[in-house]
Amino acid sequence: MADLLEKTRKITSILKRSEEQMQEDLPYNAITRQLADIIHCNACIINSKGRLLGYFMRYKTNNDRVEAFFQDKNFPEEYVQEANLVYETEANLPVTHDLTIFPVETKDDFPDGLTTIAPIHVSGIRLGSLIIWRNDKEFADDDLILVEIASTVVGIQLLNFQREEDEKNIRRRTAVTMAVNTLSYSELRAVSAILGELNGNEGQLTASVIADRIGITRSVIVNALRKLESAGIIESRSLGMKGTYLKVLIPDVFDEIKKRDY
């Protein structure tokens, strides 16, 4: 019991992860490594769309094709759809099962391979799946307890992070709307023309050329850019005779300007 408690504490420490760690490319490499070390298995976490959030390969069980999924950080759509239909932990699935993590061409190499899938959901929201696998030995009850605890911990962390991201998006959209509302008719035309000059979210432009083309003064463009920059929506840098370098920091401004029909 003491051993199980200590293992549980190691897993729940994931709740102390910072927001910065959550924004890493693979934010759950740490917990998959902990699980793999504690349970002696391979482990990975995917979200409900199949994006890889973290993995750790303790044992070589897959071929180049499957390892490409880990490199690309995406799982096959068919597999993800099947995994999303798992509502309770499915333990010790054989290599003949549709949800086995072992690729079909390696079944002869790992005939006793076993896969366990634990759904990650909080408050009825499906957030992803925690998948662990071994070459031969079955996962015991203690292993499954730890897996379910881990899936719950990851679910809570993912939900909190998702809510924080939603709040950030709302604040960003509000900032864009408020900034655009301060623009005059001429400034709106200027911003629309400027955004149309960019290559994606950034680019180089010449204010005087744009001003002449749409029939406004250069000062209108300068004022419009200053308002957006002070709101944190764009950043700009003078390139001297070459014009101005502009980068959009909050892409929502494209849709907001488009809604104004400029």
Curated annotation (Swiss-Prot):
Location(s), subcellular: Cytoplasm
GO function terms (MF aspect): DNA binding; DNA-binding transcription factor activity; GTP binding
GO terms for cellular component: cytoplasm
Keyword annotations of the record: Cytoplasm, DNA-binding, Repressor, Transcription, Transcription regulation
CDD domains from the UniProt entry: HTH_ARSR
Pfam family, one: CodY
Domain of life assignment: Bacteria
Region (GAF domain) location: 1-159
Xref: InterPro entries: ArsR-like_HTH, CodY, GAF-like_dom_sf, GTP_trans_reg_CodY_C, Transc_reg_CodY_N, WH-like_DNA-bd_sf, WH_DNA-bd_sf
GO BP annotations, alphabetical order: negative regulation of DNA-templated transcription
Spans through the membrane: none
DNA-binding region: 207-226
SUPFAM superfamilies to which the protein is assigned, alphabetical: Winged helix' DNA-binding domain
Record's function text: DNA-binding global transcriptional regulator which is involved in the adaptive response to starvation and acts by directly or indirectly controlling the expression of numerous genes in response to nutrient availability. During rapid exponential growth, CodY is highly active and represses genes whose products allow adaptation to nutrient depletion.
Similarity annotation: Belongs to the CodY family.
NCBIfam families attached to this UniProt entry: codY_Gpos (TIGR02787), PRK04158.1 (NF003170)
Name used for this protein in its record: Global transcriptional regulator CodY
